[in-house]
Amino acid sequence: MLTYPNINPIAFSLGPLKVHWYGLMYLIGFVSAWLLGYWRIKHYKLNWNNDQLSDLIFYSALGVILGGRVGYMLFYDFQEFIHHPWVLFKIWEGGMSFHGGLLGVVIAAWLFCRKYGKTFLEVGDFVAPLVPLGLAAGRLGNFINGELWGRITDVPWGMIYPHVDDQPRHPSQLYEFGLEGVALFILIWCYASKPRQQGRVSALFLMGYAICRLIAESFRQPDSQLGFVAFGWLTMGQVLSIPMLLIGIWLWWAKR
């Protein structure tokens, strides 16, 4: 069995300012998205320019942070939000929802489309290959924070989280790093390397993420304040992923 390493969540301090690893992971995600977008524009000679790319990353960053935090409080910790609304601003403590962030990015993309006259699916197809590496960085942030641990297991790589209990658990943050991050990146990046019908890349991302999340959540300990939210075995993350999967299937079929 493995033991979770005692990692200081603070990467470094600049005077009174403490820079957390979790925040750095988000910065890495946004920077990697810009670099990948820049490479795709140049390599594939896409009808995008650097100003549009920078604006898109900026809009998306706001959508991810605001939507992710609000989504977490609404989907996962609503009672805490009602009684202590100021916790909404404690982003460095963790507590971000991918599905909330996705909704935030949808709104940001809509505003971006209005500004630049691009279609929503064109923007979605451009953004989709840029996202998984950011998801991978976010899951590493979860691991460093020692949060979102897995269910009790007897597999040889089970990890004991001393701050939780003395039972070996699935390192589910690393599973999600591998599935939602690395595997999904390879899938989407390779698929988007050739011209595709508009909407197909977006559809593949929606389906791919939903499937990865549905699998990974089966190893993850449900949030203590929620438990299983449907049928006695579905977690909130799985419930929120099902509409993604259905929309992805519908979009894939519609764009065949």
Swiss-Prot record:
Transmembrane stretches, start-end: 19-39, 56-76, 91-111, 231-251
UniProt-listed Pfam families: LGT
The enzyme's E.C. designation: 2.5.1.145
Topological category with respect to the lipid bilayer: Multi-pass membrane protein
Keyword set includes Transmembrane: yes
GO-annotated molecular function: phosphatidylglycerol-prolipoprotein diacylglyceryl transferase activity
Matches recorded under InterPro entries: Lgt
Pathway(s) per entry: Protein modification; lipoprotein biosynthesis (diacylglyceryl transfer)
Entry's Gene Ontology BP terms: lipoprotein biosynthetic process
Positions annotated to bind a 1,2-diacyl-sn-glycero-3-phospho-(1'-sn-glycerol): R139
Subcellular location: Cell inner membrane
Top-level lineage group: Bacteria
Enzyme class: transferase
Keyword Heme included in the entry's annotation: no
One annotated Gene Ontology cellular component of this protein: plasma membrane
UniProt keywords, alphabetically: Cell inner membrane, Cell membrane, Membrane, Transferase, Transmembrane, Transmembrane helix
Record's function text: Catalyzes the transfer of the diacylglyceryl group from phosphatidylglycerol to the sulfhydryl group of the N-terminal cysteine of a prolipoprotein, the first step in the formation of mature lipoproteins.
Family, similarity comment: Belongs to the Lgt family.
Protein name listed in UniProt: Phosphatidylglycerol--prolipoprotein diacylglyceryl transferase
